């Protein structure tokens, strides 16, 4: 098989796994992948996941990969809060939550961090369209906040929560308090309820 044949078949997927390759060509020689990576014709994303280097220049594609290389997962926590303008800092890692174990990956597209949650807490995310028509799974602002408070329990006092420097205008004018309350109830966590109460007190919600 030539690289051109391989690229023609798989390029539109954006990123792909070795399983997808074998589903297409059961007798595929995986040594080809090693050679093509060395030549710069492919990018290794993590074990058994790959992409074409042309996608390095595409907007939002680094976030799209986050959904694909560790599933099920959705983007949340600091990356989502930064996207919505709730926190002022630019986020280096692309942060997600998943029902799989906590993990971190690095590749040419960036650094990916996944925090583990129970399967019953995999809700509160929506498909967000990308420029090229693909979609990626992204937490709502309310779920991103609750995921953060749930997974980082040291945010339990006013001093710690104030260090997040959440945007006051967003908190008071755009945050959906009804949705926040609904999501909070689904966690069934007294500790999270206490942390959320402190947060609401700070921002007079």
For each predicted feature, which ranges?
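Short beta-edge/loop segments at beta->alpha junctions of small alpha/beta modules
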Residues: 1-72, 108
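Hydrophobic alpha-helical interaction segments
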Residues: 125-205
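Structural motif detector for alpha-helix initiation sites
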Residues: 3, 18, 77, 141-142
């Amino acid at each position: 098989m030539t690289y051109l044949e391989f690229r023609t078949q798989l390029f539109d997927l954006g990123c792909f796994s070795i399983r997808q390759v074998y589903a297409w060509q059961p007798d595929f020689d995986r040594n080809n992948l090693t050679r093509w990576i060395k030549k710069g014709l492919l990018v290794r994303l993590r074990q058994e996941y790959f992409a074409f280097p042309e996608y390095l220049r595409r907007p939002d594609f680094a976030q799209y990969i986050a959904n694909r290389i560790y599933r099920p997962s959705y983007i949340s926590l600091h990356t989502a809060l930064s996207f919505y303008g709730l926190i002022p800092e630019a986020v280096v890692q692309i942060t997600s939550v998943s029902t799989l174990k906590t993990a971190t990956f690095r590749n040419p597209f960036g650094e990916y961090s996944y925090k583990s949650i129970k399967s019953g807490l995999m809700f509160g995310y929506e498909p967000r369209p990308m420029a090229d028509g693909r979609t990626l799974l992204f937490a709502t602002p309310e779920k991103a906040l609750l995921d953060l408070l749930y997974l980082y329990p040291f945010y339990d006092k006013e001093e710690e929560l104030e260090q997040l420097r959440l945007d006051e205008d967003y908190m008071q004018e755009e945050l959906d308090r009804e949705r926040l309350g609904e999501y909070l109830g689904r966690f069934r966590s007294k500790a999270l309820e206490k942390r959320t109460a402190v947060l609401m007190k700070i921002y007079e919600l």
